[in-house]
């Protein structure tokens, strides 16, 4: 025998079915970052007003070894389930929502919520990711099902506002009730 010699098993093991059989469990165990939850306004909002709540999630990629093979996985956010903390939920929905400029806070959005009572509410989001994988640089294959990844809850304080009308003219009577120079006799 002269030259290089290749040694291989006459019946090499096909690892793709074995990788496919365990890929969904491995996908669930990846360190996928859940969506970041943001509320506007925050950490306080008003009862009866629209509170814009939105998710920020991105595609995440991982290179792992499964059964001795190089596997590239990608996790893509596809749906969100919003838990507003007052017994109300939205979703699953593909709507991630998004930030509003401060001068538009209070506007209704696809993911906003109106709180009907005051108090502290634990707001959270469950993000569903769809995955694909490629073995040893091969084609991307879908991972069956989705992975569910919860965001840590954030406490949102819902306050009430009181509006009062005053008849005093603060330029004439700077110490009048409701004027900057007024002091509450009860304090």
Predicted regions and their residues:
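Extracellular/lumenal mature domains of secreted and surface-exposed proteins
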Residues: 1-187
């Amino acid at each position: 025998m002269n030259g290089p010699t290749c040694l291989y098993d006459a019946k090499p093991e096909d690892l793709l079915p074995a990788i496919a059989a365990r890929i969904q469990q491995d996908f669930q165990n990846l360190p996928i970052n859940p969506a970041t939850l943001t509320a506007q306004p925050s950490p306080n909002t008003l009862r009866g007003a629209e509170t814009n709540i939105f998710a920020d999630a991105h595609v995440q990629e991982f290179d792992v070894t499964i059964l001795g093979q190089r596997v590239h996985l990608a996790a893509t956010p596809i749906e969100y389930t919003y838990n507003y903390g007052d017994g109300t939920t939205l979703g699953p929905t593909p709507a991630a929502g998004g930030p509003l400029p401060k001068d538009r806070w209070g506007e209704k959005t696809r993911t906003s919520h109106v709180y009907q009572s005051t108090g502290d509410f634990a707001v959270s989001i469950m993000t569903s990711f769809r995955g694909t994988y490629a073995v040893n640089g091969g084609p991307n294959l879908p991972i069956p099902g989705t992975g569910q990844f919860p965001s840590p809850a954030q406490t949102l304080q819902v306050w009430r506002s009181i509006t009062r009308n005053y008849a005093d003219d603060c330029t004439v009577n700077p110490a009048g009730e409701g004027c900057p120079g007024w002091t509450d006799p009860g304090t």
